[in-house]
Amino acid sequence: MKLNNVSLSYGKKVVASNINAQLLPGELVCLVGRNGAGKSTLIKHILNIYPDPKLISVVLTDKIDVERLTVRDVVAMGRMPYTGFFGKLTKHDEEVVTSSIKLLGMEDFADRQFTTLSDGERQKAIIAKALAQETPYILLDEPTAFLDHPSKVSCMKLLRSLCKEQGKAILISTHDIEVALQECDKVWWMADGTLREMTVDSFSPNLL
């Protein structure tokens, strides 16, 4: 995935320009910057450039309306690019859904109503949905939001393992800098109206 001379606007305001970056298979990249730097706008821009749901799965901060659906139902929505909106799940689809639920440690919540979950539990279910989509690229906007510290660490280690073991390319936008830097391969730092690719060693949270 390449970004070549990308400009980002929020309304009529240009928030960043001349963005050049590349996300490679097997990489876990941390997207950081102050509020308003354009991190969420960049993620949405990438989705506009690469709209194929079999290529990129995404976890955004927007709340989803899934009244009366169970956690399993929500995770199964990740299979829609392969089944269609009203498509019947195959045995393989069911196995992928179950595996994704287990990876997030949500087995005991699988048959619970999504709307009864805490914010942290909902976040895990949405990440499981993204995993069930089985895409080579995953974009996550604040994936560790609402999670307690052990769950933040566990989430980052899971994302790291997906990169190493399955060759997925993952971009996460986060304010949990110290936790993320423990697992990330490199940093995309948004500041001063542009983006800089940096190694983890060369980046300091003091820059924010």
Segments (PLM) and residue ranges:
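H-loop (His-switch) and adjacent beta-strand-loop-beta switch element
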Residues: 187-200
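H-loop/switch region of ABC-family ATPase nucleotide-binding domains
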Residues: 174-175
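Conserved structural motif at the start of ABC-family nucleotide-binding domains
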Residues: 1-3, 15-18
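Conserved ABC ATPase signature
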Residues: 113-117
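Catalytic Walker B motif of ABC-type/P-loop ATPase nucleotide-binding domains
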Residues: 138-141
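The feature captures the beta-strand-to-loop junction immediately N-terminal to the Walker
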Residues: 32-34
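Helix-to-loop junction immediately C-terminal to a conserved catalytic motif
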Residues: 47
